[in-house]
């Protein structure tokens, strides 16, 4: 197991210095070249249709303790792409032999994302910045974008809004949301956006709306009412997220299929907020059974009719199916794209 826990540099070699990495340990360039575009017989190239996203809350820790169970889930679901958030550090060898992996990391053991893509699928390009023309990675390794022939796949780990404006977290989140809005307004292909988006859009997306709406840290109340409440459930965040969906013409795949509130399996996060100012025992008890849906698959409206399933894989307040994280995996499956119909032959 030790061989997995080595940071990798941009060329894929182990490195003691932490840095953003775009490594494919199984060989091949960091950013894939042009796809073949077909099978040689005029048919379009096969593209991924089954996706899994998971905030692992440290991939290293999950591999040490919960990996066999998670590996069984992956084997059973057989996703074409696995998107992971909060990896903290890269692994020198991919834990999934049939997948190639791309990493984007922070300079410290914080945040970071990974994207595992089955080797039979060839992305045209992989980027690590919302500005896809930039060669730089996003701060803290929060973005990976894989471009396929007919769509873009975006994996993000959104910054937490935090509790206090004085810590600049509100401003950081506002800037992030502004950049995401600009991105979705200008994408040139249908989009599949997944990851820990750190926001619950509607009251149906949290287990206890009144609790989260009135949540405070050590009694502190932000001066702006729009910033009050649990990070991820403040009026300002929810409003901005709704605008991103509207302006980007995006569909929440899970809510598209699941219209009713599911108190057992309709949430992706459960736990207590982490912070130096929080008394762990008091807050862990207070937050027991309090859950939020903050992990998503959002798809462009052009893809809405292809949604086959979108499921949460965690259940109950005992966090069955969370695999040691405070987030559970979420999956999306699309149907095959309908080939363009052949022109009707004129009748004799």
Feature map (PLM): residue ranges:
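Surface-exposed cleft-lining segments at the edges of enzyme active sites
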Residues: 130-136, 158-180, 225-230
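Structural motif corresponding to alpha-helix initiation and N-cap regions
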Residues: 64-68, 140, 238
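N-terminal, active-site-proximal structural segment of metallo-dependent hydrolase catalytic domains
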Residues: 1-95, 100-113, 336-348
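Short acidic-hydrophobic surface loop/beta-edge motif
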Residues: 44, 144-148, 332
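Metal-dependent phosphoester-hydrolase catalytic domains
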Residues: 1-16, 20-27, 126-127, 202-348
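Structured beta-strand-rich core segments of catalytic domains in phosphoester-bond hydrolases
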Residues: 86-165
């Amino acid at each position: 197991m030790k061989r997995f826990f080595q940071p990798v540099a941009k060329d894929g070699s182990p490195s003691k210095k932490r840095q953003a990495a775009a490594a494919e340990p199984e060989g091949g360039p960091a950013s894939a070249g042009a796809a073949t575009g077909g099978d040689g017989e005029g048919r379009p190239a096969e593209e991924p249709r089954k996706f899994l996203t998971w905030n692992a809350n440290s991939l290293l820790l999950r591999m040490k303790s919960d990996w066999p169970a998670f590996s069984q889930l992956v084997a059973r679901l057989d996703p074409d792409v696995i998107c992971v958030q909060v990896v903290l550090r890269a692994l020198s060898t991919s834990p999934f032999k049939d997948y190639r992996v791309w990493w984007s990391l922070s300079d410290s053991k914080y945040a970071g994302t990974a994207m595992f893509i089955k080797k039979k699928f060839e992305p045209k390009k992989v980027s690590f910045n919302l500005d896809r023309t930039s060669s730089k990675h996003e701060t803290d390794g929060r973005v990976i974008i894989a471009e396929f022939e007919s769509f873009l796949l975006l994996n993000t780990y959104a910054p937490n809004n935090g509790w206090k404006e004085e810590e600049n977290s509100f401003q950081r989140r506002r800037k992030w949301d502004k950049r995401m809005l600009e991105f979705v307004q200008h994408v040139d292909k249908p989009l599949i956006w997944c990851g820990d988006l750190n926001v619950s859009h509607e009251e149906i997306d949290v287990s206890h709306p009144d609790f989260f709406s009135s949540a405070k840290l050590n009694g502190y109340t932000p001066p702006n009412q729009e910033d009050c409440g649990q990070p991820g459930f403040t009026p300002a965040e929810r409003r901005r997220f709704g605008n991103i969906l509207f302006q980007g013409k995006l569909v929440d795949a899970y809510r598209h299929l699941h219209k009713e509130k599911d108190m057992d399996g309709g949430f992706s996060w459960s736990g207590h907020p982490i912070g130096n100012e929080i008394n762990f025992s008091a807050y862990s008890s207070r937050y027991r059974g309090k859950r939020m849906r903050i992990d998503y698959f959002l798809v462009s409206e052009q893809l809405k009719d292809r949604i086959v399933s979108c499921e949460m894989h965690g259940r109950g307040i005992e966090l069955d199916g969370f695999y040691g994280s405070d987030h559970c995996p979420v999956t999306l499956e699309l149907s095959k794209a309908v080939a363009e119909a052949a022109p009707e032959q004129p009748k004799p």
